[in-house]
Amino acid sequence: MYKMVDNLYNDIESDANIKEILTNAQDKLVILMFYSKGNPNSRRLLGHMEKIALNHCLSIFCVINMDKVQERDSRFFNNVTVPQFDFYYQTNRFATYTNLNTDKDIEQCVRMAEQYVVTQNNSRNNGQNNQSVNMFGSNSQMNTMNQINPMLVQQQILNNMQMTNPQMYTYLLQNPMTLNQLTQQQIQQMQQMQKQPMQSGMTNMINMPNVSNMIGMSNMNSIPNTIPQIPTNIATNQSSIPSIPSLSTNNNDPLPTMQQLEKWFKLFQMMSAMGILNTSATPIIPEQNQNQSNDEYEIEAVLPDGRKIYKLPDGRFGVCK
């Protein structure tokens, strides 16, 4: 036995190797192909299987060389027809295909088997998650619907046909598409049968009153309608709150007008020139202007605290009380 790729074991010669692979596969899909070098169809399908293995990395493909196998466990080698494809999950065989003729037939069977494995894994996970949750039995019904496995349904159809209609059994083995259609029809019928009791249970749930809403409404009714009032004896020092001058001449305007913007910008320029915008700066008044009377200069603006802004001859501005 040797590995061609990570998920393809070629030339298996012992049933011990098969047991080891199935045990280590755990929850993965395992496909066994029984191969014989003397069978032309077997050699042709081997090439198809090797290509398919490259596109299905999560599944494990095994090629059993029937020409070299000595010890044959009846669990794996029971009425084997070369070429034959057996599908395993959790060390259990759930499907067998014979007389596959094309790569499309193999591809379709592999995809269907992978869907079955995914369904099984999801069903197991849902079963574990729902053990602690039980609501009117709906979870158990949903788990039952999740446990409808396509491969088991397909195998059941083949078993019934083999017992009742051998010709139809042979036809289905040679035509996987027809077998797939019958499987889908059977699954739909099973789901419809399971939905009927589930829908009746859901109807009972809808007719039940919403207990949480009733509790919420009762709590709302117990809320007092009176709104707590703020005590009026809290002293507030209005004089400690500095008054902010309103530069707008029209307080009803949501946005400043162009004239207001021009006035504010002019005032900003004057305050910037005097250093008022910087609290650490002190206004500088030239010495030649300190001895002159304030009445000689034009008053540009009056600040809220009563100080007046004068325009100096050199173009700068000064502030005086």
Swiss-Prot record:
Superkingdom of origin: Viruses
SUPFAM superfamilies listed in its UniProt record: Thioredoxin-like
Protein name, UniProt field: Uncharacterized protein R467
Taxonomic lineage from the root: Viruses, Varidnaviria, Bamfordvirae, Nucleocytoviricota, Megaviricetes
